[in-house]
Regions:
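Cap/insert and terminal regions of metallo-dependent hydrolase folds
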Residues: 169, 189-278, 362-367, 385-451
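Hard-cation-handling environments
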Residues: 231-372, 386
Length: 464
C-alpha cells in the first residue's frame, strides 16, 4: 500500500463524536461523523469544529444512524461536503428521521433563546432542516455482504454489527500497492437479543482494526435475566401505585423494550397497566423498523405466530404535545418510555421533573449513561439536579438493567475479536471511557495483537 494514514477526530479517549479520517489510495474517506455529547460547553465547541476542509472529503462510510455517529453529517454538508455517504438501506432510512429531528430541535431551541433575548453565536444551530434534507440525498444504500467500489483501488463491504437496525461493521480493502485491509467495528451489539441479528464480524486476516470499547471492562446480565428483572421492577412499583420512568434511545432500545413488555404481558408476568411511548422520534423510527423485516432476527417465528412486534393492547403511542402533557398529571401505575436515553433532552426531562420527586416511582436505566450527562448523575445517586433551569429533588427509586444494552460486554467483545479468525496486525481502541479503553487494549493484547493503540483526539498514525 502507498502512503496512508488514519486520524482520529472523535470517540478518541471518550465515547461520543465518532469520526475517523482515512487517507489512502489518493482518497480521503471519513468513517462516521457523529455529534459529541456530555459536558455541554465542551461538546458544543467540539461539535462546531470541522478540523479539515469538508469540500476535500471524497466520501463517508457510516456505521449506523445513532446521532453520536451520524449527527455531524449535515454540518459537513453545510461546510461544502458533497460526496457520497455509504450506509445500509435501513441506516439511510433511519437517518431521514434522526437527522431531521436533530436539526428541528436545534432550530426550535434557537428560536426559544431568540424570543427570550438569550441567543448568541454559540447557540446558533449547527445545521438546518434544509442541510439535513441535502444530506439525505447523498446517502447511498449498500446491502450487507455486497462489495462496493468506493474508488478504483478501495472497496467496501458491510457485515452485521448487531447494534441497532441497519448497524454495520466496515470492511475496507485497499489494493493500491501492497494490499491493506482495514476493519472498523462500528458499535458491536449483543448476542441473543430479539429483533436485531447477532453481530457477524468480517473474517480473515486484518491489517488495521478500529474497535469500540464501551463495555470492555464489564459483564452484562443475560437477556433472560434482564426480562425477569424488568417484570419484577414493574410488579413492585405498580403494587405501590408508582410509575416506571424509562429513559430510552428512540432507535433500538425503545423497540426492544416494547417487544419485552409484550412478552411479559402475554406470559402473565406484569399487571395490566398502561405503557406510554412518549417519543415522536421513536414512533417514526418504529415505522422504519416495519419497513425492514428482512433484516430482523426472528422474522420467521414472528410471522408464524402472527405476533405484533411493536404493538399490543397496553401500548399507547403519544404523538402530540398535548397527549404528552397529560402524562404530567397521570394517576395510578404506568410505564413511561421516552427519549433521550441519557436524559440530556426530550420528553423524559418533563417526566422526571414532574414524577422524579415521588418515592413511589422508579427511574429505570436500560442503556449507557455517558460521563457528565444528567442520566449518569441521577444513576449515580445525585439527589438534587437541575432540569430546565430549576432545582429538582430526586426521591424516586433508581434501578439499572444492563441486559438490554445494545453494546457488547467484555466477553462478547473478546468473542467478536476471536471470530475474525485471522491474525490482526494492528488495533486502535476507540469509543470508550478511559478505563474501558485500557481494558479493551488488554483484551486485544491477550488475543495476540502485537500492536495496540489508544489514540487521542486529533492523533494521526501511518498505516504501513
Amino acid at each position: 500500500m502507498a502512503a496512508a494514514k488514519i486520524t482520529f477526530w472523535g470517540a478518541a479517549g471518550q465515547v461520543t463524536g465518532s469520526m475517523h479520517l482515512l487517507e489512502a489510495a489518493g482518497a480521503r474517506i471519513l468513517l462516521d461523523a457523529g455529534l459529541f455529547q456530555g459536558k455541554r460547553k465542551e461538546s458544543a465547541e467540539l461539535n462546531r469544529e470541522v478540523p479539515f476542509d469538508a469540500r476535500r472529503i471524497d466520501g463517508v462510510v457510516l456505521s449506523h444512524a445513532h446521532i453520536d455517529h451520524a449527527g455531524r453529517l449535515p454540518l459537513l454538508v453545510n461546510r461544502g461536503f458533497h460526496g457520497p455517504i455509504h450506509a445500509t438501506a435501513a441506516t439511510r432510512d433511519l437517518c431521514a428521521v434522526m437527522l431531521a429531528d436533530s436539526a428541528h430541535i436545534q432550530e426550535k431551541d434557537f428560536e426559544y433563546l431568540q424570543r427570550h433575548d438569550r441567543a448568541g453565536p454559540e447557540s446558533e444551530p449547527l445545521y438546518t432542516m434544509r442541510d439535513a434534507a441535502r444530506t439525505q440525498e447523498l446517502i447511498v444504500g449498500v446491502p450487507y455482504r455486497r462489495l462496493q467500489h468506493l474508488r478504483k483501488n478501495v472497496t467496501l463491504e458491510f457485515t452485521d454489527a448487531g447494534h441497532i437496525l441497519g448497524s454495520a461493521s466496515v470492511d475496507l480493502r485497499i489494493t493500491e500497492g501492497t494490499p491493506h485491509r482495514l476493519v472498523f467495528s462500528g458499535d458491536i451489539g449483543r448476542t441473543g437479543l430479539p429483533i436485531i441479528r447477532d453481530p457477524n464480524p468480517p473474517a480473515g486476516p486484518v491489517d488495521t482494526l478500529i474497535i469500540e470499547s464501551t463495555y470492555a471492562e464489564r459483564e452484562h446480565e443475560t437477556v433472560l435475566g434482564a426480562e425477569e428483572r424488568l417484570g419484577e421492577i414493574i410488579r413492585r412499583v405498580a403494587s405501590r401505585g408508582g410509575k416506571v420512568l424509562v429513559p430510552a434511545f428512540a432507535v433500538g432500545r425503545t423497540q426492544e423494550l416494547v417487544y419485552a413488555l409484550n412478552e411479559l404481558f402475554r406470559n402473565g408476568k406484569i399487571p395490566r397497566i398502561p405503557v406510554y411511548i412518549d417519543s415522536p422520534l421513536a414512533i417514526e423510527a418504529t415505522t422504519v423498523f416495519r419497513l425492514h423485516p428482512d433484516i430482523f432476527d426472528q422474522t420467521e417465528r414472528l410471522v408464524e405466530s402472527d405476533s405484533p412486534l411493536f404493538d399490543f393492547s397496553l401500548v399507547n403511542y403519544t404523538r402530540d404535545v398535548e397527549d404528552s402533557k397529560k402524562l404530567n398529571t397521570l394517576r395510578g401505575p404506568a410505564v413511561i418510555i421516552a427519549a433521550s436515553g441519557m436524559v440530556e433532552a426530550g420528553r423524559i426531562l418533563h417526566h422526571i421533573k414532574n414524577h422524579g420527586d415521588d418515592h413511589r416511582n422508579c427511574i429505570l436505566f436500560v442503556g449507557f449513561q455517558g460521563e457528565h450527562t444528567l442520566g449518569r448523575r441521577i444513576q449515580e445517586g445525585d439527589e438534587t439536579v437541575r432540569i430546565f433551569g430549576e432545582e429538582r429533588t430526586i426521591r424516586a427509586e433508581i434501578e439499572t438493567i444492563s441486559g438490554y444494552s445494545a453494546h457488547a460486554d467484555r466477553n462478547e467483545l473478546r468473542s467478536w475479536v476471536r471470530r475474525i479468525g485471522g491474525p490482526i496486525r494492528r488495533a486502535f481502541c476507540v469509543h470508550g471511557e478511559e478505563s474501558a479503553l485500557a481494558a479493551m487494549a488488554e483484551i486485544l493484547k491477550s488475543e495476540g495483537v502485537p500492536e495496540v493503540h489508544v489514540p487521542r483526539h486529533g492523533e494521526s498514525f501511518d498505516l504501513v
